[in-house]
Regions:
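Acidic (Asp/Glu)-rich catalytic clusters
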Residues: 14-19, 38-46, 77-84
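Residue-level marker for beta-strand->alpha-helix junctions and adjacent short loops that shape enzyme
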Residues: 31-32, 54-56, 95, 126
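Short, electropositive alpha-helical surface patch
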Residues: 17, 22, 48, 105-112
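Active-site core of metal-dependent hydrolases
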Residues: 20-30, 48-59
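Divalent metal-binding pocket/active-site signature
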Residues: 1-40
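Histidine/acidic-residue-rich catalytic or RNA/ligand-binding cores of hydrolases
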Residues: 7-11, 34-44, 59-73, 96-108
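Mid-to-C-terminal alpha-helical segments outside catalytic/metal-binding sites
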Residues: 78, 82-87, 98-130
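Short acidic/histidine-rich active-site segments
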Residues: 27-29, 50-52, 83-100
Length: 130
């Protein structure tokens, strides 16, 4: 399994300036609650961003709805546009949140069909060679 590391977009940027990993997936769109830093520092870099716990709302499996400061639709679309839809992967915060809600949140953005397909599975299939 891959190593899990928590860091800021600025820390990731420093690493990327030193090394060029073959494949790197950054959870939570590259920096949870640091969306502007992601836009400024990481978009366009040779990394993947996943959508887990980043956009929409979180409803835990026990039914409780928690209001977290997740990014709004304008910021999500700005990151996807600047970074490129080819490098964004759909993700959920499962098992802590409801997967169907995460799907509904992304579907609700009304992204162009090609962009939606890439994010919702085509990119992951290409990355994993399946």
């Amino acid at each position: 399994l891959p190593e899990v590391v928590h860091c800021t977009p600025a820390m990731t940027e420093e690493v990327l300036d030193e090394v060029q990993p073959d494949k790197l997936v950054l959870a939570h769109m590259g920096g949870w609650q640091m969306w502007q830093d992601v836009l400024d520092r990481l978009c366009g870099r040779d990394v993947y961003l996943d959508t887990a716990f980043s956009y929409g709302h979180i409803q835990y499996r026990d039914g409780a709805v928690h209001k977290w400061k997740l990014m709004d639709s304008d910021m999500f679309k700005a990151i996807v546009e600047k970074h490129g839809a080819d490098r964004v992967l759909f993700g959920t915060d499962s098992p802590w949140s409801d997967q169907s809600e995460a799907i509904s949140d992304i579907e609700g953005l009304k992204l162009p069909e090609g962009v939606r397909k890439k994010i919702m599975g085509e990119n992951a299939a290409r990355l994993l060679r399946i």
